[in-house]
A protein has these predicted regions:
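Short intrinsically disordered, low-complexity coil segments enriched in acidic
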Residues: 1-2, 17-21
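Extracytoplasmic c-type cytochrome modules immediately beyond a signal peptide or single-pass transmembrane anchor
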Residues: 24-207
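Detector for the c-type heme attachment site
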Residues: 212-213
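Bacterial N-terminal signal peptides that target proteins for export
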Residues: 1-11
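Bacterial N-terminal signal peptides
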Residues: 9-19
């Protein structure tokens, strides 16, 4: 009997350096949870940009109102719905201290990316602006990495960008994510220790929704 599989769009991969020994990294669930939350927030940003494509690409409007502040409100709501964490009140949330430090920095990087594209987004008389989720995600991740040295990427098999091509471990993770028995709810992840125990790699699956098929 053929095993049923589910199509996946790819995975988010996060390399989080924490300078611990190999055994300590495995025991440090805080590092893994921080990586998971960062992946969910980054994906929430991509989803938000995707949901606003009709507005962004409307040639009849000048000022779209899709400001960094408007983006922040939407992505904060989406992240709260998915991760059950309120970015506006992180001090009261039961999340790792590392996450309390890094989540606002990722949000700032995403807002800065939206700010950079304001002249493009608000250009009248032009349809497609090129400000798509992939572009947003790459540039926001680069800004975040420059400030924190935490590396984020989205990969798939095959990958459109050779620089983001999955390695053997990521290919195996994607195969596991594609199994019909793998949970589709709860933002489940796969993690491993890398760089001689100095960092942890966290992978979050991205599944195709009905609207993508």
């Amino acid at each position: 009997m053929k095993r049923a599989e589910v199509l996946i769009a790819g995975v988010f991969v996060i390399f989080l350096g924490i300078g611990l020994s190999s055994s300590a990294v495995f025991a440090d669930s805080d590092a893994v949870e921080t990586g998971r939350l960062l992946a969910v927030l980054h994906d929430s940003g991509r989803v938000t940009v995707g949901a606003n494509q009709p507005l962004i690409n409307d040639p009849d409007k000048g000022d779209k109102g899709f400001t960094p502040e408007a983006f922040e409100k939407q992505v904060t709501d989406k992240f709260k719905d998915r991760a059950k964490v309120n970015l506006a009140d992180l001090k009261s949330e039961k999340v790792p201290e590392m996450a309390k430090k890094l989540l606002p920095q990722l949000l700032d990087a995403m807002k800065a990316t939206v700010a950079d594209y304001q002249p493009v987004i608000n250009r009248p008389g032009v349809g497609f602006k090129g400000f798509i989720p992939a572009t947003f995600g790459t540039q926001a991740a680069a800004k975040f990495r420059a400030k924190t040295n935490v590396y984020l990427k989205q990969t798939a098999n095959p990958s459109r960008n050779p620089k983001n091509a999955p390695d053997e471990f990521e290919l195996k993770a994607m195969a596991k994510f594609a199994e019909a028995s793998y949970p589709r709810q709860g933002e489940k992840i796969i993690s491993e220790v890398v760089d001689g125990g100095k960092a942890v790699r966290v992978m979050l699956p991205l599944f195709y929704g009905k609207g993508c098929l």
